[in-house]
Amino acid sequence: MLEQLKETVFKANLYLPKYQLVTFTWGNVSGIDREKGLVVIKPSGVEYFEMKSKDMVVVDLEGNIVEGDLKPSSDTPTHLALYRAFDKVGGIVHTHSVWATAWAQAGKEIPAYGTTHADYFHGTIPCTRPMTETEILGDYEKETGNVIVETFRNKDPMSIPGVLVHSHAPFVWGKDPMEAVHHAVVLEEVAKMAQKTLSISERTLPMDSVLLDRHFYRKHGQAAYYGQEKR
């Protein structure tokens, strides 16, 4: 079942240690088949280099295991909440990458200071509010997804494909699992650049909005011209 998606999700998970986004098993990638309403996700607590594509777990959008011998990631309810809310998202990544997680632990959003940021994120990368005691002690992972959805109530998740969960770490997404990993790598680099920028000048202001728009829309707008035409 969903063998091609399993292989894609498996390979996407292996990029997390390759790009130094995870330590031990501190992260996961998932992908969704929208037509079937099924999600493929990394198994919980399994080392990346011990996994096979057949170890990926298939669940429905309510979290029921449809196929797989292993338990799905403990973050599965968060992924599912995002898939239910963001209908254009096709892949999700969660990591504890050092620089992005540092911003999350500080409870700080990441302003757009330069064009590297603007090429992928159309504005500030938000940080969620702190979760309440009731949310933490209740259905914690599902509530983590809900607080992310709340944060994007007036934002386009495809224009800002990532978030920092307060006191936790980043969740990032894309149109498919590989794009989600790409965005996770970019988020980590942007977080590092932002912190280094502030270490040079703590009074640095966000970049000019005209420049922000130019860089974002040249890659993602209707008249985008960056890269090669698809044939």
From Swiss-Prot:
This is L-ribulose-5-phosphate 4-epimerase. NCBIfam families: araD, PRK08193.1, PRK12348.1. Coiled coil: none annotated. Involved in the degradation of L-arabinose. Catalyzes the interconversion of L-ribulose 5-phosphate (LRu5P) and D-xylulose 5-phosphate (D-Xu5P) via a retroaldol/aldol mechanism (carbon-carbon bond cleavage analogous to a class II aldolase reaction). GO terms for cellular component: cytosol. Binds 1 zinc ion per subunit. Pathway: Carbohydrate degradation; L-arabinose degradation via L-ribulose; D-xylulose 5-phosphate from L-arabinose (bacterial route): step 3/3. Its EC number is 5.1.3.4. Substrate binds at G27, N28, S44, G45, S73, S74. Belongs to the aldolase class II family. AraD/FucA subfamily. It is an enzyme of class 5 (isomerase).
